[in-house]
């Protein structure tokens, strides 16, 4: 799904680094997969993949399964990790992350 945007080796390494519950840190993950240095268009493409229901927002249930976008066998995020991830990205407080919020979070 991320061919031409992200390298498989970077994705594998990033997933390995947060394999244990409680170890997911979105900033580190975005850096490890190489997303931080990507163009706004590429970041928008990645957002479109994560936005599974195509609502133009990433909601809490989609964040919980965030890692599975990168590998079907990846774990779900814990409730605490999901809440932290949502809080970090949801700058307008509407309970979901829009594409601009996602881009701002990726750029850190």
Curated annotation (Swiss-Prot):
The residues listed in the UniProt record as binding Ca(2+) 1, with positions renumbered to this chain, are 51, 53, 55, 57, 59, 62
Give an example GO molecular function.
Answer: calcium ion binding
Q: Which Pfam families match?
A: EF-hand_7
**Chain positions with N-acetylalanine modification:** 1
What extra comment accompanies this record? Is regarded as an important allergen. On the 2D-gel the determined pI of this protein is: 4.51, its MW is: 11.35 kDa.
Q: Which cysteines are joined by disulfide bonds?
A: none
Instruction: State the organism's lineage.
Output: Eukaryota, Metazoa, Chordata, Craniata, Vertebrata
> Glycoprotein as a keyword?
no
Domain of life of the organism encoding this protein: Eukaryota
Residues folding into a coiled coil are: none
Q: Which GO terms describe its cellular component?
A: cytoplasm
Give binding positions for Ca(2+) 2.
Answer: 90, 92, 94, 96, 101
* Protein name listed in UniProt: Parvalbumin beta 1
UniProt xrefs under Gene3D superfamilies = EF-hand
Q: What PANTHER family has UniProt attached to this entry?
A: PARVALBUMIN, PARVALBUMIN ALPHA
User: Its function?
Assistant: In muscle, parvalbumin is thought to be involved in relaxation after contraction. It binds two calcium ions.
- Give the family from UniProt: Belongs to the parvalbumin family.
Looking up InterPro entries in the UniProt record yields: EF-hand-dom_pair, EF_Hand_1_Ca_BS, EF_hand_dom, Parvalbumin
**Keywords, ordered alphabetically:** Acetylation, Allergen, Calcium, Metal-binding, Muscle protein, Repeat
The segment(s) forming the EF-hand domain are: 38-73, 77-108
């Amino acid at each position: 799904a991320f061919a031409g945007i992200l390298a498989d080796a970077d994705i594998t390494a990033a997933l390995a680094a947060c394999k244990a519950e409680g170890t997911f840190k979105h900033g580190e993950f975005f850096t490890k997969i190489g997303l931080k240095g990507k163009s706004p268009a590429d970041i928008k493409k990645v957002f479109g993949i994560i936005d599974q229901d195509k609502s133009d927002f990433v909601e809490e249930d989609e964040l919980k399964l965030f890692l599975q976008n990168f590998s079907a066998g990846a774990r779900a995020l814990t409730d605490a990790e999901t809440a932290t991830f949502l809080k970090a990205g949801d700058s307008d407080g509407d309970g979901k992350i829009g594409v601009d919020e996602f881009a701002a979070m990726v750029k850190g």
